């Protein structure tokens, strides 16, 4: 029998629902009685912002689907119809396309925060793995959605990415044909990608988001000091250094969400193309199998991996390095041998390595947008080496680093050293 939890509602209808559905316990477990550290900083805002963008993407995607036609003959024209003839269609389309870029901005910052404060370490390894699975699904969702406008750049970029599967030994060619449903990117491919984009992957993303949050609330949130607040409790059994997520953290989050939405809508209204980074110029032309864009590049949020692909002379090895560049994130909890979580108390080795990694990732992102010639290839190879060195050398430099003493309780204001 379920535990008898006193209802928090006074409204008769809500109390009636609460007697038949665990609404009160859900709110208590995940909001009013879920305790998080008092010293959260701005880095802890990006997880909430990712949820905000996810809602925006689902709502705008729903309305776009009402008027979009997933066929090679009608796809491009249906997008133009949405932009020109559907009431506020231009706004919905720009909210969706801008939202895709903002989604990856907040996701990358959310991942970087975990790397700053050791949020992937015990007991949060599963949270990290679920988060990475969610990241993989988001990458797939973005890729499948990228082809749907049937612009010339999305057509040829899709051709390049799908062909990478052909380098898988033994069954690569068969897998590539299965993904396309044809011998080349065609109407069949577009229909398949549409099905993945609007049904399969959104369901997978929702499931992983729920699992990610449940796992987080089961073990508790990390904090900038990397200490466990459950260790010190008051007489009521509540963490001394924790506050209820609602209303304390939700109130602060609302301020951050407001600022974020101002920036987001400024981009939507004044720079939806963002100089060709959010919406490429070549995608304003319909797909043409006989006209290759001068410079084929994927969306900017994939360009770090694209630069790694092009940095390796052998195409098959380049594809392997691309896959490894993404997969290595999953193994961070086991590659990092240091007992200390937060960068505040870690040695100079990890601080230097993480800084070099961040520089490498940003540099590769820039290089992936440039032509694969001369100095750009040489720099891409250098930063590919530093990118992989962060992961592959981690078991060694994290063992050698000299750490500071970690406080028993959270620190509310960082003291100057």
Question: Where does each model-flagged region fall?
Answer:
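Membrane-embedded and interfacial regions of multi-pass energy-transducing membrane proteins
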Residues: 2-102, 106-417
